[in-house]
Amino acid sequence: LEKPETGTITIDGETQNLAHIHGKDLTELRKKTSMVFQNFNLFSKKTALQNVMEGLIVVKKMKKEEAERIAREQLKNVGLLDHANHYPRHMSGGQQQRVAIARALAMEPKLLLLDEPTSALDPELVGEVLDTIKKAANEGYTMLLVSHEMNFVKNVATRVIFLENGKIIEDGPPKEVFNHPKSDRVREFFAKINRMVEPEYSI
């Protein structure tokens, strides 16, 4: 969405210089990725089924019948096949985000990008979205997830990166990062989190 000033990215064994990529190469790189946004970004005047079909038809130039078959399959995978003909305004935030995930997975991305996918949800709806993401992870999808859901990250991620002011301050396997952080800042962060979850009273 924004062009980096420097850096490279390697997807599916192919490395690209992000500062110099353009035209056809940029288009092909984008086809290998899918994005799930904080605020769903569904087309409000299209049904759940049509939202999932859109990229398949417009980007992949797929025939409508094949696009619908794949879209229904993905909606079934996220538990929303019975909502195929519902418009976003008739779905909860959690349901809308699951449609957004189905839309992203329908494109068969090599890399799935998720930007705080639960931040716009009521707490009671977070679980259903995290379960959907965990299921996709277990199916072998490669994901880059931005999240403050620490327990989820700890249990699902294979690599954890802590960022502060745009800089990496901790990077490693979840067990190492959560149990033995090297950065003072990360240790401080976990200490604050632990204090927040500890009860301030006893019964």
Each model region followed by its residue ranges:
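C-terminal boundary and immediately downstream tail of ABC-type ATPase nucleotide-binding domains
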Residues: 164, 175-203
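ABC family nucleotide-binding domain
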Residues: 1-164, 169-170
